[in-house]
Swiss-Prot record:
Gene3D superfamilies to which the protein is assigned, alphabetical: 2.40.50.100
Provenance organism: Paraburkholderia xenovorans (strain LB400)
Segments of this protein annotated with the region Disordered: 1-21
Entry GO MF terms: structural constituent of ribosome
One GO CC annotation: cytosolic large ribosomal subunit
UniProt xrefs under InterPro entries: Ribosomal_bL27, Ribosomal_bL27_CS
Protein known as: Large ribosomal subunit protein bL27
Family in the record: Belongs to the bacterial ribosomal protein bL27 family.
Length: 87
């Protein structure tokens, strides 16, 4: 009789789903109020003018305008600002 031995089992073979972190709107691009600018773990970038921070450290626009990235201080902190659109 033809037989096939049982295949082994493995406890590996899993991976977590990617979290899609990173910059969503780049410098100079237009953004509406409430739009997400950066998704991040921890404060790699800090909120500046017209930018709010969610409880998961997501940076979002508080007003309509254009996104601007800059550094601040001796520690060269990365700041994210929204320059309001001219009315």
């Amino acid at each position: 009789m033809a037989h096939k031995k049982a295949g082994g089992s493995s406890r590996n073979g899993r991976d977590s789903e990617s979290k899609r972190l990173g910059v969503k709107v780049y410098g100079g691009q237009a953004i509406n109020a409430g739009g997400i600018i950066v998704r991040q773990r921890g404060t790699r970038m800090h909120p500046g003018e017209n930018v709010g921070m969610g409880k998961d450290h997501t940076l979002f626009a508080l007003t309509d305008g254009h996104v601007n990235f800059s550094t601040k201080g001796a520690a060269k902190k990365h700041m994210v600002n929204v320059v309001p659109a001219a009315v």
